Amino acid sequence: MRLLERLYFPLRKPQLIQVPIRPLARPYLYRPAAAMDLSTDATERKGSVHHDTHATPPQFIQKEHWRYQSMRKADLDTDPNIFDLSKRDEFSEERKDIWRPAGIIPAAQIDAACQAYARGKPLSVPAQDAQIFEHRDFPGLQVISGLLPPETQVLFTSCLMHRDLADPGHKINLQADYDIPYPPKPTSDGLRFDSSFFLRQRSDPDDCLTPKLPDKLKSLNNEQFLYTKLRWLTLGEQYDWPTRSYAKHATPFPEDLSTLVTGLFPHIRPESGVVLMYSAKDFMPVHRDVSEQCQRALASFSVGCDGIFIMARGEDDGEGENAPRSVAIRVHSGDVVHLTGNARWAWHAMARSIPSTCPDYLANWPAGTPGSTAAEEKTYKKWKGYMGTKRINVSCRQVWD
């Protein structure tokens, strides 16, 4: 696998990545963001970001990244430096002051967005108002716990992992090295997933991904492909990992996913989505999302197992407002991290995925796929429990002004 590709998708733990040290094109300066505003122009800024896409992260955030990677699972539950916003009601007053209410997404808006995503099917359990919390010292870092209802999470996972993964127009990390026998095109554009890699046998010697350089790589059966080798999928505008830029010729962004994102966050017009698949020992290195030409906010959706998300501001030797500081957040299935203002361009990472934390309503997926026939469900049961081992993160962003 190419080194540059490996730097920006889930990696196996533990391995030290050596990257060339080069100075920033200009120092990263923290400027306090304005008050929370989810209007269309809230995240517009004059000029261009001009961040160096190959800059090296500060040492202090890399040390935090490795600290959480090596921490025992049991210690994650008691670490006082990790914020779990699903338990904010249990916070001390001091900790509550760190995460302040920054707005609400009304229940009616959530219901409407999820119903539109499900092609008009209403939620079986009406949504509740979703509180937005913003970090006091990281303006623009906002978390909405449990924004996606359980049934929407199941549909969300099905659309991504059945339909979108089976579409060769959406790139995956293995396309450069393997010839991939994609399933036939779906026969329906509704909520029927009759074209999927999960409708194949787990281990069939006649149904494999064949390497383009057979003297260097081995063939992969479907189980090896889906459980261990699949790391990322790109939707819409195709992000090029080696150059860290976007191609000029767009692949259409999934229309239903666009409807969901815009329904929840009207100020974002999603044009690209990076889907990352984490297993128990996978992590995302420290990086910044600075390749987009547009200055709009980014919405990052999580489904599956919990993860530890970290963010940093400041520099190793900075002082005052530029002093080094970091924050760690435990994100759950259904949570959304919304990055706007200066937080949109901050260093961040997914330090680890936490195994055996996927909620019961999703853990057995693809068993229980919406709209499946009896024959399809029989095949899905052979893959039962796939999502119980996975964490999927989908960051939806607008690329162009």
What residue ranges belong to the model's regions?
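Cationic, low-complexity basic patches in intrinsically disordered or flexible, solvent-exposed regions
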Residues: L16
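Non-heme Fe(II) oxygenase metal-center motifs and adjacent flexible, charged/small-residue loops
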Residues: Y8, V19-D401
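N-terminal chloroplast transit peptides
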Residues: M1-L11
